[in-house]
Amino acid sequence: MSVDYGVIYNRVDRFLQTREGLANPKKASDYKWFVRELSGIFCGAAYEHNLSTESVVNFLDIVQPHCINGIVNTGKVSSVCDLISDHIKHDPLYYILERTLMLYKPASVQVGPGEFFMCFYDAGSVFGIDNTAGYDVVVDGTTTELKSLGTNLTTPEIFDKYAANPILQRLMVVKPVSGAAKPQSRSVYACIDVDKWRDAFYHRNGRTLAYKEGIK
């Protein structure tokens, strides 16, 4: 099935204008690059799965007003898909692009897994594209720092610095769905108030970030 890149490009552009920080004027030189990348992702997914241009546009239409609510903030390992409304999850593009959007880094912006995904699916989000903001994203109305499970780029000392940051409210650690053809589990996360991070996370051997609660 043929895909109309121009139609998808224009719809992606309009979509991104609704997400604060993703069309940040400070990064204006990167913005068109960003739109091209994301348009290419959607065109590729549609082509590979025999979906129409209209299917992509309709998906963006239903995601644009969507808000993420009810993030579990107790440190419990929870399913990311529970944060997404059923009518979106019933669209094949949600699962087709789950891993891609979890790992996607807009243009030249340095972000970690989950940051773009959360802002994509939350109309009220703020993408902390400025590295002096003191947080990665605002999602579900709360300033949030995101990290990836298993990363070796954090330490207890770094997390303690996060806890001392008066702007930052909570810490979220995500494990994106695997790239397997039939993954055994979908993306998960654990989230907790940043000053209680030791109740939910630890650093194996002092560096490798892990959940205290096992993944079921």
Briefly describe each language-model feature range.
Residues 2-134, 142, 146-216:
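Nucleic-acid endonuclease domains
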